[in-house]
């Protein structure tokens, strides 16, 4: 299916940008994304944000996640999109897709009426403003699974963008609600593969107890540090995923460095995490080369007739 992304006039002529959207929704396994996404989409409640730049495959990954839920769980999936991209058919779930301008007058009106339609899972096409963000958090706190996209470079930048929607007076209440309602922020970038085509590099921030406390305090730099030091259980940074793909020869080192948030951090991981077994063997070889003394014999001139040659054995 071909979708017109944008139509415009230039130099007196008509121009357009088209997007090719496949009819068949890909599976999560075929996209080379973390297996964790298979379980995240089956959650009963919470807010899951998919963030990244334009054209990084956010919509494709979200569609694959929704199809996973559609195939495995009975329920009602409601999408409010501008425009509709992937088309779903009912499987274990009933999927209703509403397009802004065609099925609902505006995104806000569609969201206002969403709870009356008894959804279990709600997909919001994109969060661009405070009103949409407030609705997404509110629905997550009321027991629904909410999915949406945002434009941000990574997880902690997404947190900063969410905060920027609100006035300083409203931010403490927002942070408390976000800490309680957020389930995960998934960031994605498309990287050229050595075998051709592109593969996603994925950062996952899970809202663990530690991350929740840091969000409530507004300490977003602390969230970044917790992820880098693997203190946020289940989370992974771009550098961790890029290092994995470089090690498995899925991408080149130069390509990984170009897409890393911190090339220095990625180089450190490649040097220290790639071959832990070889480092252990190297240490063992070094220890084998060192001189060892298992038996020491002391031959002492006896100043006292009672003094004798002593033999000391060390084990």
Task: Give, region by region, the residue ranges found by the protein language model.
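Short, flexible helix-loop junctions that flank or precede catalytic/ligand sites
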Residues: 1-315
